[in-house]
Amino acid sequence: MDILKSLGHPEELFNLFKFKMGGCSTVMPKLDYESMSDSLRTCYLYLNQTSRSFAAVIQALDGELRHAVCIFYLVLRALDTVEDDMTIPLDKKVPMLNNFHTFLYQDKWCFTESQEKDRQVLEDFPTISLEFRNLAQEYRDVISDICQRMGVGMAEFLEKKVGSMKEWDLYCHYVAGLVGIGLSQLFSASQLEEPEVGRDTELANSMGLFLQKTNIIRDYLEDTQVGRAFWPQEAWSQFAVRLEDLAKPDKLESALSCLNLLVTDALRHVPDVIAYLSRLRNQSVFNFCAIPQVMAISTLSKCYNNPMVFQGVVKIRKGQAVTLMMEATNMRAVHTIISQHSQEILQKVSLTDPSRDKTLDILALIREKSALSQSTLPSRTHHLSPMYLSAAMLLAALSWQYLSTTAAQAQGPGNIQGQ
């Protein structure tokens, strides 16, 4: 139960209860689905089905940008589904990836042979492509361009492994950096952000690389169990003969050294993340960008030097995720969150870790970039008396159980919003 995992964190209990009571309406407002066309409503249904985390922040964007980003996400989700489907032979998959951007202008194109869990975005691609063609030209140009470049990059890496650290950067650029670049161009096209945001592709690329590397690091076990290899060979070959050997109990010390090396590499993007977020002016765009980034550094902090990466699933608590989502709405709070998780990593750096010096250097740079006078920062700690805390925890636990039960009873099959 989510609330039990947060019992030692009173601020998480408070935020879980607040979240259940609708306290996140400013971050995740409900949409008016009744005013949408059937095809657009279906697109938001697919968005919620394929990614609840991204769906939440996408649906909170302002104005027409919301629809553009929704369609952008679904187009790339469809492309990614083709890449991930191991049942599609290469001689069929490579041309599909290279030509996928052309399907946006083919009103009847669909693919019904996928075995992936998100195959509905391929089977009903005509609905998605219809809404793509309904977008303003400036949005269509960005989405089509990024789709084309990403498809070519995915096809390139289908036939080769991620070898060097530079190739890891290149792969992550194709599958995530381009997403950051495309989103930034959409922000500027909407005029919610300045043209500079869309022009600075280096910072936008770093935003995507930080998220993608975090996911790749966290998903080591899941990926290797199905034959996928995204950890760069240049890194893991220093510690094992085969990538999957890192999961062996007798390889734990080597596995942690490799893990820490990759976490350190991912952390080098954090200064760019700080610089990028500092430029944003629209509140909905800031929330959209900041929330995944603080989730990522929280996840990296939990992954660093953690044997569970090689034994199971490493996730942050739901209460922690809700707290981050509710707090990461301004730059001061983001600085604080980044500083706190950087400090958590610092406390876990071993004297014998091979990457120790590099880790300490990048953590020092991150602390420098996010340094603010502690006296001017909003407190993230709730100082509660023992009696009040006990009563609040009991009330929150009972209320959470009641609300979860009633919500489950009331929720119908057509509820598009999800949890």
PLM features: what roles do these ranges have?
Residues 336-378:
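Long, charge-rich low-complexity segments
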